[in-house]
Amino acid sequence: WLLAGARLTVRDKQPLAQMLQGCTHASLVPTQLWRLLNDDAALSLKAVLLGGAAIPVELTERARGQGVRTYCGYGLTEFASTVCAKEADGAADVGAPLPGREMKIVAGEVWLRAASMAAGYWRDGQLLPLTNDEGWFATRDRGEIINGRLTLLGRLDNLFFSGGEGIQPEEVERIIVAHPQIQQAFVVPLDDAEYGQRPVAVVECD
């Protein structure tokens, strides 16, 4: 966008609708776009890139009715965000890799490679490698590639997303069972129209 002559707007700690005043393009999670449309606020947005959760067709159609084109994307923080993108069309796939990104499926898992990606994970004073010896990053996402387009099928672990935030059930369970009156806890995702999924804890108490 910047190379194309656009201006980047950075605003801090304001309501979403206020932050986006005057903006024509934005990257949002579906929950944020739902809230914008439900507020009936005047929108200057022309196009929105959506990601971080399942994207309902109802949402993209409603946005289109208000003059906002929507694009669905798949990305990771390790890759400076977007890896695949396409204009939302109701199909299940998230599009083809953007220029400079490579993608393949290994034993049902999505593997990625690109020049613009993180050098590694910084832990305990050390930079841990992100990729294997051939430069491929194993995402832990399940997927399939049909006609060059990626369709995501879920996770290989228990991670799920709520409002664009990744939630690892085991981490939440560990905090819950730290309470002296909780014997055990099990956290599961529950489908939610606004957040995509919400975490729900089933607990056994003393």
Give the predicted meaning of each segment.
Residues 1-39, 47, 71:
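AMP-binding/adenylate-forming
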Residues 44, 105-106, 138, 145:
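Generic beta-strand structural signal
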Residues 96-99, 106-135, 155, 165-167:
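Conserved ATP/PPi-binding loop(s) of AMP-dependent carboxylate-activating enzymes
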Residues 2, 64, 97:
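Anion (oxyanion) recognition and catalysis
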Residues 1, 26-29, 48, 52, ...:
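Residue-level signal for inorganic ion chemistry
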Residues 50-53, 74, 113-115, 163-165:
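Glycine-rich beta-strand-to-loop/alpha-helix junction loops that act as flexible
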Residues 114, 135, 140-206:
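AMP-binding/adenylate-forming catalytic core of the ANL superfamily
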Residues 25-28, 36-92, 102-104:
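Gly/Ser/Thr-rich phosphate-binding loop
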